[in-house]
Amino acid sequence: MKNRLECMQSIRFLAVLLMCCLSYTTWAQTQSNVNGLVTDFSGEPLIGVSILVKGTSNGTVTDLDGKFSLSAEMGNMLQISYVGYISQEVKVESDKLLRIIMEEDTKKLEEVVVIGYGTQKKVNLTGAVAAVSAEDLASKPVMSTAQALAGLAPGLSVLQTSGRPGQGATVKIRGTGTFSKAGTDPLVLIDGLSGNIDDVDPNDIQSISFLKDAASASIYGNRAANGVILIETKKGAQGKTTITYSNSFGWQQPTELPDFLPSWEYAKYYNMAMRNMGKQEAYLPEQIQKYRDGSDPDNYPNVNHLKWLLESGSGFQHQHNLSIQGGNATTSYNLSVGYRNQEGMTAKTSNERMTALFTMKSEIAKGLMLNLNINAYNNKYNAPNGEPQSIDGMIGYAVRQGPIYAGQKSDGSFGYQDNYSPEAWLASESFVQNVSRNISASGQLTWNTPVDGLSFIGKVGMNYWTKYDKAYRADTYFDESKTVGPATLNVWTANNTYTTFEALATYEKQIKNHTFKLLAGTSVEQSNNKGLEGYRNTFPNNYLYELGSGDKSTATNDSSLEEYALLSFFGRINYAWKDRYLLEVNLRYDGSSRFADGHRWGLFPSVSAGWRISEEDFWKNAAVSAVVDNLKLRASYGVLGNQNIGVYPYQQIYELGHDYPFGNPATLQSGAYMKTYNNPEITWEKTAITDIGLDFSLLNGRFSGTLDYFYKYTSDILAPVEVSSIMGREVGQSNVGAVSNEGIEVNLTYNGQIGRDFWFSISPNFTWVRNAVEKLANGATEEINNNRIVGQPIGIIYGYETDGLFVDQAEVDAATEQLVSKSGLKPGYVKYKDISGPDGVPDGKVDAQYDRTVLGSTTPKFYYGLNLSTSYKGFDFSALLQGLGGHKRLIGSYMAYAFYNGGQIQRWQAESCWKEENPDKWAEYPRLETLNMNDTNLQTSDYWVRNASFLRVKNIQIGYTFPKAWTKKIGLENVRVYVSGQNLFSFNSFYKGWDPENEIGTGDSPSYYPVNSIYSFGFNFKF
């Protein structure tokens, strides 16, 4: 029995051993090293191609010769991926060398961009067009579309001048083209309808195109001189319904804040200022001590009014967007709703906005397509009111009010300076409320006729906008001796109705190697704008703030009505031979009711050509084609117009309210008088643009870029013409000015991959612009009061050059004659240079006529951006840097001058001022004294001008997308979380505590709202 058991165990052991051997043999036959070579179609080896065994983490990359080797089983699928090429899968079927040929991803070559009245392949563009996609905007969860564009595209200047809730940004394309009231705003079209760039939620945008030259923009004629921005909203797609929800939550704080001295130091340096002026000190030592120890805060306070005001609000903001997309074989749709709420850094300040978007595309019959677009918003802005009547003004005067003035005292009263007390006004029932609503709707029918390539398009659109604004300033209690009143109420209401109709025909035909595209159309636009305003004061209490509650005897009112129309005919011809030689001609004929008969019609043509050098046989056969796969040279010229000059400026203007005596005996009769001489000859401003560009891509699309040179010349700029005062009245505008902008744009992008999972993209852009005034009215070479000189940029700073400060009395005695007599000069004062005289050489005295010069310009010479993005497995990181440079700024008033008009003193002024014990010629601040606007030291000079260039870390975002294997378990297709920072910090040499991008007042009534940094987080869900 025992032997039998031993025999059975031996048999089992041998069986197991045999099975192991067989298994090993089978494994050895199926598991082996797979060797391969990866090349492109020309046979060139591709380096760094990712090779991954599907369903595993087993992978490798190709070496310098395009070769790879890895272990795999027979039947395994290898996933091959490479930037610029179509990913593919290859089955392991033998141990022979795998030869894999990668197919170039033609998506880049087939990429289309939105242009005027259509789309165009990017590689076939002959104009200067930049594009921003939904993905570019997604990494910047900002409240404003305009703010999201900063640094994204060459030729685009974006300035965020305020952090006020709901505030957008100023957008310019290729410099400042005019100094007239026609303005520099680009034409913005949202799904083909005229609008504002912030009318649409950034989450609802599919793409934005910037038409920068005449070739791309002339199809819009006399509205396109400042460039055109085309916004396309998101559309639905065929397939199952998808629901997407995104949100963000964030907090704001100022990017910069001035460092004001506390009350005891304020008193100390105020005494110094008094001594420097030969006056008695204002504060005794025991008073300064009371300010320091805080023992009597009502009478000896220490209040930083600016900091208090900017910390009175929560600064919390949140936004949400929910969209539903879907469709079938004939119909697709997109429905989106959005909500955002931004609480200000100051209390009672907020912006609440609700948006809705609906788009639909449906084939209602064979060859007949219907497109519907509806976009709407409701916007509500709230802010405190006071003296002056805006939150910006309140902040400006909080800059002025020193720490020696109390906030709210223990008895409930308020400290104040004149009529200014942010604490009192914020506690009052005063308010500003602005409510605006807008709905934009369009319908388009497209008939693709039985004739191949021929289509007809009809489109109607309507935009209705309304607003209701209310500003109430209550009777406001300061203390027993001061109440500001009476209460006042201003109400404004307005509405605008804009309608448009378009009819277009397009035809596309290819004859052998010749491709033709034709477009012809006409459009009619009408605008009707109505306004009404009313005012009353003296109300029974602070809670009845309706016009009917005010004193009827104080009532005033006004109304307005403006209408204009535009009739246009336009066309475009595109020709291409083998997609190698490209030609485009645009023509638009506009008639505008804004001008007088005989001057209403204008022709706006453009022509452009392109040469795709990379399509030439000699290029394809050259070795360089293996590196440079796309190379195109293009050039364009055309003329654009700017009709945005107001309504009917050619008409004679009469002013009512002037009585005249009539009859015998003479009695006064109601009448009017002619206020201005009209000019029926005026017409639109014209901008001629020359553009030469180069587009290229290398390394199979991994590295691409564009280079552009442009020259813009704007003529017939509208400006008033000076006439003799003997005429007794004003003269209307005339086409008398000219401005030029010459520049270079560079845009580069590199997309790379390291290993299997690490992807990155680097995209810098740079724009340099030389702006110059070319012509002024009456043949003048300068208009100093308007800061304009022929040959200089718009917005010059005109003033005195300085030679530091007077060090001592000996230097004062030896100095040339300054702006004041020597008896009024002191050591530590600004020393102005004598640079010229009547004969063009220094004449021994400084005066305004001969010794002022151009100190700089507020117009930037260059702007740039750097976009960085990376992803590793589920993690992603993006960063955006934005900068402007080559310009200067001058701020004054309470922001720059210590003790100005009873204002404060900042730490840098106190610590860096000229002192008798340390008489520094180059001290950052002059001799400390109390100041007002007419002081000698405060003349516009290079002493006060600062370099306003800056480099800002505009946005950083870090996100994580959860694996689909996880999210599908909870019924979600995609889940992403992120943290983000906006306006994180900047590098600049501007005034300490002040942001160079901020719009800051310079006069005795300054106003500003600090630009804000935003720290946020959010979630994206896709169902």
Residue ranges and their predicted role:
Residues 266-301, 390-425, 470-488, 530-557, ...:
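Surface-exposed loop/turn segments flanking beta-strands in extracellular/periplasmic regions
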Residues 344-353, 375-388, 436-438, 446-540, ...:
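Small-side-chain secondary-structure face that scaffolds active or pore-lining regions
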Residues 178, 193-236, 256-262, 303-321, ...:
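Outer-membrane beta-barrel proteins
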Residues 1-357, 362-365, 369-371, 375, ...:
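Short, small/polar-rich motifs associated with maturation and membrane association
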Residues 254-256, 297-338, 342-349, 355-423, ...:
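Flexible loop and strand-edge segments within Gram-negative outer membrane beta-barrel domains
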Residues 295, 592, 884-976, 981:
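Extracytoplasmic gating/loop element in the C-terminal half of outer-membrane beta-barrel translocons
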Residues 244-298, 649, 734, 751-858, ...:
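Conserved small-residue
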Residues 313-331, 338-340, 423-471, 490-510, ...:
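Outer-membrane beta-barrel transmembrane strands
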